[in-house]
Regions:
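N-terminal, membrane-interfacial amphipathic/helix-forming hydrophobic leader that caps
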Residues: 1-65, 142, 202-214
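Structural signature of hydrophobic alpha-helical transmembrane segments
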Residues: 2-13, 76-82, 132-146, 179
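Juxtamembrane helix-loop-helix connectors linking adjacent transmembrane helices
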Residues: 25-36, 53-123, 130-131, 135-136, ...
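Intrinsic disorder/low-structure terminal segments
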Residues: 41, 47, 72, 77-79, ...
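Transmembrane helix-loop-helix hairpins at the membrane interface
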Residues: 89-93, 103-214
Length: 214
């Protein structure tokens, strides 16, 4: 029964991510307090993640909600940050021919949104989805691929906009974040890496990339 409940909550979290844009920008919230939609969405993710961790036996370890291996956490995070910055610099020069940072007046909003999004998406895919796939008995390699593809599908708007670079990048990010999570035993490096990827794009190419309110 506990496993069935955990699976149901996991499915709900995945569906929640697929419908996140409509939820966070719902007219129901926009006519009241604009920030209420995103806050409600992120709060739901955290609450359901905690619920699944409580339901599962040894849920925190199973879902990588621990500090992880101290010897590997910091090096993995630093590697993630370096790769994120190099990738953003390469994109800025190859696509725009120069470094074009995000205007400073937009930075506080983007900073907060990037942090919240990194925590929420890593909880959904690297903690819950990956953890549940491994709990179900799938091999590590297969579980990493499945959660990365699901993560890419969650960014289907990139497909509609023909943003192939970012669509492929979302799958690669999903796999890399999953690998970092499994390697360290903690979802924290994936959260830091995800945040670093987003902020690197803002820092080096944010002025030209299409920005939407978070």
């Amino acid at each position: 029964l506990r496993l069935a409940i955990a699976l149901g909550l996991t499915l709900f979290l995945v569906l929640l991510r697929f419908d996140s844009e409509r939820i966070t920008r719902s007219d129901y919230f926009s006519y009241r307090t604009p920030w209420l939609g995103p806050v409600s969405y992120y709060a739901l993710v955290v609450v359901f993640a905690i619920g699944i961790a409580v339901i599962l036996p040894d849920g925190r370890a199973q879902l990588f909600l621990t500090g992880g291996d101290r010897d590997s956490v910091l090096p993995v995070m630093l590697l993630f940050v370096v790769v994120a910055m190099l990738n953003a610099v390469a994109l800025a020069y190859l696509r725009f021919g120069a470094i074009l940072p995000l205007p400073s007046e937009l930075l506080p909003n983007r900073l907060l949104g990037a942090a919240a999004n990194a925590v929420a998406e890593e909880l959904q895919f690297r903690s819950i989805v990956l953890g549940m796939l491994l709990f179900a008995g799938l091999g590590t390699g297969l579980a990493l691929v499945i959660q990365a593809l699901l993560y890419g599908l969650a960014h289907r708007r990139l497909w509609q906009d023909r943003e192939w670079y970012f669509l492929a990048g979302s799958v690669i990010l999903g796999y890399a974040a999953g690998l970092a999570t499994v390697t360290t035993g903690s979802v924290i490096p994936a959260m830091v890496g995800h945040f670093a990827v987003t902020m690197s794009f803002f820092a080096f190419a944010g002025a030209r990339l299409r920005q939407r309110p978070i």
